[in-house]
Amino acid sequence: MAEEKQTPRMKTHYFEVVRKTLQEKFNYKNVMQIPRVDKIVINMGIGEATADSKKPSIAAEDLGLITGQKAVVTRARNSIATFKVREGMPLGAKVTLRKDRMFEFLDRLVTIALPRVRDFRGLNPKSFDGRGNFAMGIKEHIVFPEINYDKVDQIWGMDIIVCTTAKTDDEARELLRAFNFPFRS
């Protein structure tokens, strides 16, 4: 017998709580106008990649463990002599999450990873791009429980971009606040 697929907690939270909250606050005429999280892009830029070309693939493995999806090694688009970078040289890794994996990552980010960040005082509410997308950085990838601290040879940071269908930053801020993102007041 096929096993029943479990719906991610944040997805259920979105459909049962977040949509109603946003509908009441912004008075949308149609349910399709209610903003939603479209995708999450996680990027790791490895500065030491110029010295050791194996580091981006190690970062891609770690990113794969964190997200549950295979990461893509990113390469330099053009050569920059100042940074000793050649065209096509591996420089980092990235993952684009959508649908259920996106909601599961969002859940782990908000409930587990962010509280484990050292000296965390909340997310900057001004980190929106003007089109409803939110960008943040984490200095240590070891805050995620999937990474075994003893087996890590180097600690890397990562950029996390949450893309939403919101038209304004205020709508996106309320959407993420409804997902329990810990914004600074």
UniProtKB/Swiss-Prot annotation:
GO biological processes: translation
Molecular-function GO term, any one: rRNA binding
GO cellular component annotations of the record: ribonucleoprotein complex; ribosome
Domain of life: Bacteria
InterPro entries to which the protein is assigned, alphabetical: Ribosomal_uL5, Ribosomal_uL5_bac-type, Ribosomal_uL5_C, Ribosomal_uL5_CS, Ribosomal_uL5_dom_sf, Ribosomal_uL5_N
Swiss-Prot/TrEMBL keywords: Ribonucleoprotein, Ribosomal protein, RNA-binding, rRNA-binding, tRNA-binding
rRNA-binding is among the record's keywords: yes
NCBIfam families, per the entry: PRK00010.1 (NF000585)
Family affiliation: Belongs to the universal ribosomal protein uL5 family.
Purpose of the protein: This is one of the proteins that bind and probably mediate the attachment of the 5S RNA into the large ribosomal subunit, where it forms part of the central protuberance. In the 70S ribosome it contacts protein S13 of the 30S subunit (bridge B1b), connecting the 2 subunits; this bridge is implicated in subunit movement. Contacts the P site tRNA; the 5S rRNA and some of its associated proteins might help stabilize positioning of ribosome-bound tRNAs.
Subunit structure: Part of the 50S ribosomal subunit; part of the 5S rRNA/L5/L18/L25 subcomplex. Contacts the 5S rRNA and the P site tRNA. Forms a bridge to the 30S subunit in the 70S ribosome.
Protein name in the entry: Large ribosomal subunit protein uL5
Upper classification of the organism: Bacteria, Pseudomonadati, Pseudomonadota, Alphaproteobacteria, Hyphomicrobiales
Chain's gene name: rplE
